[in-house]
């Protein structure tokens, strides 16, 4: 593997710690120290700003704006949308004797920053020595309320060490925020109001006409003055400091947008402010700790080292998987069917806040086994945006539903035609997600009310996008781009053909079952979508005659002609060339057999039980050395398959990469935001990789394989109202139901009945 860790943060099982401040890592740290609660998010930028390289960003889930594009050809989108920064509520200025605190220019020492995964808080401490020799110890605390998700909190603590005197503090709320990528503020006229202890502002986006309200209660010691102009409202006070006396300044924030409230957002904001006033920061922090205590009680993954010599390496893995779990819990909990999971969550502007097909293929398993209702909400987002998918298919001269490669609101937002028009995997990923959810939950009500309609419209799209080759007498997809985005406009991409085959067949199967089980619902659906009687049979015919490029020994060819491409030794690529999109000519990446991310291996992972071990082995051995992992989703897929094939050294190596991808900046782009969807794959790396869970068969299957340097691995999963606790060591795996009725599973191919009594299965 050509990439290497760039280690900066200290290792701790429950914290991420930055000891000392290196300006070169400023943006990386901002991403790592991001906070969120599904509704709002904020990067770990300095409250006081300053001359430090920074992407200041507070974001609200569902807030975006739009811009028109020049369109040359039919099928290419003529407008796009993108997440924009929301109201700046951390806004703080601190001055002493005319000198303003600025860590890019000020003298400071004893700097430490700490993300507490148990408490859900970010704390920063340092000692400021002014030009006049005065010393002030400062502590900045912030957290986003995981229960009342429109609320955020900031506390600044100041303590003079060697003087008695005043410090001028300004705190504010501002919509005068600039989208860095477009160098533009997308907020229009702003309504503002201020009293000494309350600041309020409301604004509207330029084209999407979305409104946001941001208000803050302030506890500024001393007499304060307010200032309101343009898009900014502030309060300023002279705060008296003395040695041994710590002074706290609290800010309690409310953020709402009109997608959450009625027509009168200003009144809704005032009502929410009145409710938040009754809750102190300390009370909110206690509730925050209780929330995270409950989360970790059911969702923690605990890794113990085999011995002291392994302790350091395992500690890094433990920190990595907890960091991943923490960020997933911050990003999405199923609170709204209006939202999906952006590739960067609410941690940065990269990818414009868009959700991709990663949601169903990579994120969904985490929620299926930890929060099934959230998994359902993710699929309902796709149902609610089905009308946009129908329109997109029409743009592409097809029938049915073509789900977008990139979106916030359901419309295709990717301006690159080679991705928006050639990548068909979003639609088949939705089909797969529906199948996986129903397979694990047996939620037929969802399937017949929502899923079936999506499935048949996806099948319609596949049936009109597919082509028939007279030469080979088979169907296939032509002019496509598979998951490996280093090869475009190819024919018969194996992933695209295989997933299309499964989607077509599943849609026909569901309609058959629905006609028998729920004839009235079936009839209503047929009437709604004007389903022709011969359509399902045609889908089966295409599926039965789909071309899957494959050698006699079951090595799948990624696409027509792939085996003839020139070879690239990926280990010869210098680390300084990454990310390749930033350093290589765009067309250069398409010329060889170098793969961005798993393509063939991806469908072997998704439908794992459909392939024998030898098929997986021959394909892994061929494609793994050709994969450069420029997609953050890639390492975990390889680790899971390597563990299954008993290549444990490779599995452990890829696991370290997957869990610490952002913490150790493997792809050299953590500065842009966290790789949220790949973080979900780090969880899968544990559960599907080392525990060997397979969830695509008739019952849950486990084949535990513990890494050599681990003494024990413990975690829990939810399944059909049950909580299954699993504890693995080198010799055995212990299963126990903590909740729910007895359950039959397979372990190493043998059926085992789980009950509330521990049952031990020896390692094989």
PLM segments and residue spans:
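C-terminal capping/lid segments that line or modulate ligand- or cofactor-binding pockets
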Residues: 25-53, 57-59, 362, 409-410, ...
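Structural helix-adjacent loops and short alpha-helical linkers that scaffold large soluble proteins
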Residues: 305-318, 335-336, 369-379, 438-453, ...
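Active-site core of glycosidic bond-cleaving carbohydrate-active enzymes
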Residues: 355-384, 512, 525-671
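Helix-terminus loop motifs that line ligand-binding clefts
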Residues: 332-347, 373-432, 438, 444-449, ...
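Acidic/polar, glycine-enriched structural segments that form the non-catalytic walls/loops
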Residues: 1-350, 585-588
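Non-catalytic C-terminal accessory modules of carbohydrate-active enzymes
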Residues: 78-131, 137, 613, 617, ...
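The feature captures the catalytic groove of carbohydrate-active enzymes
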Residues: 257, 347-355, 401-449, 460-540
